[in-house]
From Swiss-Prot:
Requisite cofactors: Zn(2+)
Keywords: Glycoprotein, Hydrolase, Metal-binding, Metalloprotease, Protease, Secreted, Signal, Virulence, Zinc, Zymogen
Keyword Protease in annotation: yes
Protein name: Extracellular metalloproteinase 1
Cofactor binding note: Binds 1 zinc ion per subunit.
Intracellular or extracellular location(s): Secreted
Amino acid sequence: MHGLLLAAGLISLPLHVLAHPQPSSTSLAGRAVDLNEYRIGHRSSYTSNDEMMKQPSIASFRAGTYVEVATEMVKQTMPNMEFRLVDDHYIGQSGIGHVRFRQTMHGIDIDNSDFNVNAYDNFYQIGQDGKVLSHGNSFYTGPAPESSPVQKRDFSDPMQALHGVRKALNLPIKAEGATVENMSEHKVMFKGTSGALSDPTAKLCYMAKEDGSLALTWRVETDIGDNWLLSYMDAKDTGKVHNVVDYVAHATFQVYKWGLADPTEGNREILTNPWNLQTSPLTWLADGQNNFTATRGNNAIAQYNPDGGNDYENNYRPSPKNLKFEYPYSANMDPPKTYIDASVTQLFYTSNVCHDLYYMLGFNEKAGNFQVNNRGQGGKGNDYVILNAQDGSGTNNANFATPPDGQPGRMRAYIWTRANPPRDASFEAGTIIHEYTHGLSNRLCGGPANSRCLNAIESGGMGEGWGDFYATAVRLKPKDTRKTNYVKGGWVNNSPKGVRMYPYSTDMSVNPLVYTSNNQLNEVHAIGTVWATMLYELLWNLIDKHGKNDGPVPIFKNGIPSDGKYLAMKIVMDGMAIQPCNPNFVQARDAILDADKNLTKASNKCEIWKAFAKRGLGVGAKFDPKNRIGSNEVPKECK
């Protein structure tokens, strides 16, 4: 999703709205279409480890690989269901095997019906073979079509679906004279169109609807820059849109060092070889085939993009022959293009440090991270992050597009016009970390091959909340305590109030948000603020118990971060991979508890419960999209 801004028009909480009202970031830019109308609904269930222990028949299976165990579990749990194994399974850094299955009907995918199993493998977890930690499920259980629509040819031509999505969403794509080419069974590509950054495609698939029925659709994929859309068009009535998913969420280096949120927190420094060879063994300036003297390498490619276009490879980027990426910058310089070298360098630096830190915490090749060359470590390569500094396609925002593993991510950092002179988003680390974290959460939740699992309203909200949480955790200072409050986007927006409803604070009088606040919120950034507030409580509960490592990287003991800050970042990340597709807050909370149970044998159970319960997500909390029920209760052993 788009990354930073808070939408206007929030329903009446007793809120002191601290952000300037902004247009909703879930709209199609300039085309008056609200994508919130087409969000996928919450259908997933999540069975936590505590619930699994009550069902011993499905908690443990005959010893085998984690994939075999997971497959057997799905067969037993969903007998007579047709499904396929998704080719993105892996064993995570914490020893959990993550396996995902897609439900099919007559050989056609049900695109929003998934089953994910978190299981152990005896090779990695001695004595745990055959055991399942938890699972998530959104399989369709309603009536099935009697026969295959492919045999009956009971669907429209895919070109009609492309025309339908153009008209329904008012897309700037022209398809007159375009041709259709077969890519694979049930999937085609449209050649000869204009207005999209790549050739649109269409795939025949089913969608499980919230009313319990099944719709045959054409999934039309269109990348138009500010939006990278998967539009599910009815395969019979191609003017009808069922759902829409948007992938976009909005040497020596002289930079603001990692940990400084923006130029007000410190001065620029010259850093020599700032990469971590454990996580970037090719350095930031090589990809195993080529050595570069510009801001490109295995993890990212950064450039100036004033026209907002797609031809990034031929765009300008700093390329000092002596590898000294040292350029002048002051927040008082104007116009912004006069310091573009410094801007691109800063964006390249911050994004690469994100890559390295997240790698240490578990976002590696197998988990679907962003690299050209995966060096035989699993996953799909050829997907560095395209970093566009001073992108001309917008202002006062930033965004990140996350297609599935094997396709490059794309970040756009804009100029902000709230100050005079304008401010460049590349210099606010919190904005860049927030955007990069969209790539992290979209690749982990649902698995590397599925970037459609943060589309439901609470799921999308958590996508925004994770971005704020990681950006805030990184900026903590040595003297900070749980009484320290932080705003989001204060510098770039030229406002001490930032761009969120409230500061992040453990003080209920400063930030009163609780789980039931979501009943009055219908915009992902607002809902994300509630989620990040809960995670901020969790962060400080773990810091109070384990202390705070103020260094730039975690210190591990037996695979566990030794301090509370990095431990919180680790279990939140592990929870992303454990939870089901399109989770709600309750399911994501349970996934974090299961992540801690796996990593530390639940030694932080009460700290986690108390953090969530303080903000209304306690034992009795229940999800209902229209009437969430809050709870401040913790388990009896935590009272």
